């Protein structure tokens, strides 16, 4: 058994990096600690130009770089020095003049950045597949008992601290080894994903029109948190996040206070935050079991999120109990006070939180308070759905509509006020489990029908919710996430007083549905876009 606390001194290091962030400072500190440095190509030149003593690998091996740099470090004096087992291979190393290399600092050719550039062709991509780098990384990782492998610039500081304390412990080297294999696994996964999308049916292999979906699907997530349990207490769970999230979300949020997030907290907070991102004006979204139960937008900044919260809460105060609340503006003291004095809440998330609001929420120690940071444009990404023995992969639903995208299909067009409410209700319906029906007035939900097998029943539930909350349906608008297959959905809407409807259209019986709306004097618009959510 290896002693976890035994420290490994570093006498010789090999440095060869594409990303040179922090490498000059790291090398200077190593030099100051008496470490001999071997280096290659651009890294060697950077060190030399800045007065850091280093030996070029070609001078050390006696073998010049060749094949336009394809062969630099693939040499027994390099890999023997990395893979040589101290105390076992010493004699053979001495016989061949191989010096032990105790630390390897390597990161790889920027394959992902290269293939992301417009116009990148297959030969360019191939030339940016690193060979020597991963080979050194894997060699050093395999021999982590005797060698430290550093692939992340973020680790330079802790490595130097340990060296100043006498060396790296085995536990530290093991952790660095794990990071190294994670690094090479992600790198190879990127290459396989890219090449797996190449059109192999063409006479000449081409990346033009390459498939979005490679032959094997490789992606990497990093464990952020182990949880007490999963969706239910008998299930184990953990939360994994993308290594480099491209967009603000629950995966990048910062928790300011409260109990540890549960599995359901994460899922519900994601639903609330993604919904509230849809709105430009001050907005509040309250979610329960991944469904919005109350959403409202304040038409001006004067009322702000306090007014939006009051209206969202009024939609369904019963369901709001123990829910998740998301805002698209900084959480202020007045809104925080209104929440803690009125209801039990699991999670509150906002782009930022004022000092006064944070102090108020602190009186409820169990409330989980999160900041998301401010978001910008929604970016394309993948959505995943696990099935038994497989994985469904699709592009994320970031489809949005504006008034210009809508097609008025009835004799009566919506009024300006109705149009604003229709677009609001449509944005909400996108985040409601199918079949989804949303009733809204004055950019406030007044009833949400979610997750029913029958669209008509979802509409009935929305009406029941509105009645129970004491909110008037007469004159409200209705949004449906998918088309109405029969006219009964519109007939029921007319009975409760709905004045305008927004839906995708596309049913075989659209003409019957439109006729039902015309008979009732209901204005109806088609979006041409469906928002199923399962």
From Swiss-Prot:
The keyword rRNA-binding does not apply. It comes from the Bacteria. The lineage of its organism: Bacteria, Pseudomonadati, Pseudomonadota, Gammaproteobacteria, Pseudomonadales. GO terms for cellular component: cytosol. Belongs to the PurH family. Residues 6-151 form the MGS-like domain. This is Bifunctional purine biosynthesis protein PurH. The keyword Transferase applies. It catalyses: (6R)-10-formyltetrahydrofolate + 5-amino-1-(5-phospho-beta-D-ribosyl)imidazole-4-carboxamide = 5-formamido-1-(5-phospho-D-ribosyl)imidazole-4-carboxamide + (6S)-5,6,7,8-tetrahydrofolate; IMP + H2O = 5-formamido-1-(5-phospho-D-ribosyl)imidazole-4-carboxamide. PANTHER family: BIFUNCTIONAL PURINE BIOSYNTHESIS PROTEIN ATIC, BIFUNCTIONAL PURINE BIOSYNTHESIS PROTEIN PURH. GO terms for molecular function: IMP cyclohydrolase activity; phosphoribosylaminoimidazolecarboxamide formyltransferase activity. It holds the Pfam family MGS. GO terms for biological process: 'de novo' IMP biosynthetic process. Pathway: Purine metabolism; IMP biosynthesis via de novo pathway; 5-formamido-1-(5-phospho-D-ribosyl)imidazole-4-carboxamide from 5-amino-1-(5-phospho-D-ribosyl)imidazole-4-carboxamide (10-formyl THF route): step 1/1; Purine metabolism; IMP biosynthesis via de novo pathway; IMP from 5-formamido-1-(5-phospho-D-ribosyl)imidazole-4-carboxamide: step 1/1. The IMP cyclohydrolase activity resides in the N-terminal region. Its EC number is 2.1.2.3, 3.5.4.10. InterPro entries: AICAR_Tfase_dup_dom_sf, Cytidine_deaminase-like, MGS-like_dom, MGS-like_dom_sf, PurH-like. Keywords: Hydrolase, Multifunctional enzyme, Purine biosynthesis, Transferase.
